[in-house]
Amino acid sequence: MKDKIGKFKNIFGGISLIEILIAVSIFAVAATISAGALMSMTDAQQKVLALRIVQDNLSYALDTMGKEIRTGSSYHCGIDINDFLATPRDCSVFPGGPSFTFINSLGDTITYRLNNNRIEKILNGNPATALIMTAPDAVIVLLSFYVVGSPANDELQPRVTIILKGTAGIKEKIKSRINIQTTISQRLIDS
């Protein structure tokens, strides 16, 4: 069969091999880019979720500590993590103290310290009563206490500054660093 110009019509119309290869290549590139973007978004979601869990946990721990410290007295900055004395003692220079002891509103001696990358609360100087205040997901690498104004008659209201540094996340790829600082002053008027 001839068309009007005199050439034969292509009765076997279709797609050539080169066209198929180009189409498959374009699809493969698009699929690879989409898969990479999906993996990246999944990692970002895991990082945000881990960070949120740890921030909520640390916020709860610091709020709990703050409420109890605020109503306490006899602030004592410990020289090591096993210093459970409740006699007033300042430590206002770097690196601060690794533990903090005070007498709470019920008359109990409370110590906060860092032990095995977790914040512990110890009642009446007995390590057997240690209450772990942070989740395993929150790895605390530094917990320092700076106490000012704890001795009587120094004309300063007792206060403690808590500095906390840690990491959130289990996988190295999605770990986030956390730095928190808070200052708490004693409610009782210092004598």
Please place each PLM-identified region on the residue numbering.
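Alpha-helix initiation/capping motif
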Residues: 10, 47, 51-54, 153-155, ...
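N-terminal leader/signal peptides at the extreme start of proteins
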Residues: 1-15
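Generic detection of intrinsically disordered/low-complexity segments and helix-coil linkers/edges
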Residues: 2, 21, 54, 106, ...
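Aliphatic-rich helix starts adjacent to a transmembrane/signal segment
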Residues: 13-66
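Generic alpha-helical secondary structure signal
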Residues: 7, 31, 64, 116, ...
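Short Cys/His-centered divalent metal-binding micro-motifs
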Residues: 69-70
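Cell-surface, membrane-associated systems
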Residues: 74-191
